[in-house]
Amino acid sequence: MSLASIPSSSPVASPYFRCRTYIFSFSSSPLCLYFPRGDSTSLRPRVRALRTESDGAKIGNSESYGSELLRRPRIASEESSEEEEEEEEENSEGDEFVDWEDKILEVTVPLVGFVRMILHSGKYANRDRLSPEHERTIIEMLLPYHPECEKKIGCGIDYIMVGHHPDFESSRCMFIVRKDGEVVDFSYWKCIKGLIKKKYPLYADSFILRHFRKRRQNR
């Protein structure tokens, strides 16, 4: 790179440097970058000027540029846009959080309250048969989840009644009176646990360990 000579007879000109095919001119006026066109060896190269500032601000002064202009341009490819869409979908799925413990409680708590009402409210005395509505609820919503449901039902259900447990006189439970007259007790707690395991298999064990204290084993 060589410094071009400046004739003494000409007016004071702004110094400039010439480096191969590019000419850089420095003056009080806005900076211009000259890009020769055509053959770089031509004696009279044609140039184009690219104006970079209109107010004479210094090069590299970030205050003279907007923050957006200083950012490196980003070209969004089709793959990156697809990845962003997948991330947004994952985030939206994460927002839809489900508290499974509350979900299980919403189902089981009303059933437990219903059975306790039958056993302990005084509505039914020992050996009383359940009302058709209460009996239907027990048969449809609890009994099918007992681990030995078919064995308990046997030849078929005649009706369901309330009475004292044969092994624990202070405890009341429900009994199935079969069509052949045989009476069989069943644990509603086993029905509740079976319901949880059937409907919520992924969360059943942890839920049962947390909410069910160890109980005396009923038949």
From Swiss-Prot:
GO terms for biological process: chloroplast organization; chloroplast rRNA processing. Keywords: Chloroplast, Plastid, Transit peptide. It is found in: Plastid, Chloroplast. It holds the Pfam family DUF3223. Residues 79-96 have a biased composition (Acidic residues). This is Protein DCL homolog, chloroplastic. Required for normal plastid function and plant development. Required for correct plastid ribosome assembly. Required for processing and maturation of 4.5S rRNA. The gene is DCL. GO terms for cellular component: chloroplast. The keyword DNA damage does not apply. Expressed in leaves, stems, flowers and siliques. Residues 1-48 form a transit peptide. It comes from Arabidopsis thaliana. One of its GO terms (molecular function) is mRNA binding. Its main location: plastid. Residues 70-96 are annotated as: Disordered.
